Amino acid sequence: MKIPWISKEQIALKAVDLIENFQTMAGYMVKPPIPVEDIIERSLGLRLVYEDLGKVFGSNDVLGATYVASKVICINERLFEHSSEGRLVFTCAHEAGHWVLHRQHVDVEGRRNLKGAAIVSRLSDAKAPIEWQANYFAACLLMPEKEIREAFQKVCAPEPFVINNVRNTVEEGARCEEPFVEQWPFIAAAMCEAGGFSNVSKQAMIIRLQDLGLLINQTSTKMDWKTTFRA
């Protein structure tokens, strides 16, 4: 599906607007953990269901699907078996992103099955522009910039961390220790705890911190499970 380019700033504003609209409807201030399921059902007016999408689409790489005409977001129920809460919630937020950003493009070009036109989220399409946009929306929705920056000041420092080393280079017992790449799961966990991001994975958190320029990784080693801790 071809979709127009949208800037990060525009996507972030749409996520903020959705939270603010939900706050007005619900009558209380929303803080992390962001109640994405309630937002989908109450603010967007969609039905959220869980099905075995592998059987529906005949493929094991489908995480979710957004049916525009029937106003349904469907999440692969197998995520309950094989994934963390963070992955499940992020997928819900991702599909909400498709609804907010892309539903107007489905009528003509949407992929169809028995339920009508749908936007189908597949692992194999992860690098496609439409999937990147939905991923970025999900990150902005679950980890609002204001709350992230507040938590970062509590956990880390007023200024961004510049990371120059993959491993700890300071001798044990030294008072000062520079941040290093292999420390990222602990930084992410501390951020999730300090900011109340209990439904966000450590991997999603560390990506968000780098995107906002709060962690600047100057090494060639990525901050992820596969690269940092490979055998």
Where are these regions (language model features)?
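Active-site hotspot residues in diverse enzymes, especially metal/ion-binding acidic/histidine motifs
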Residues: 1-231
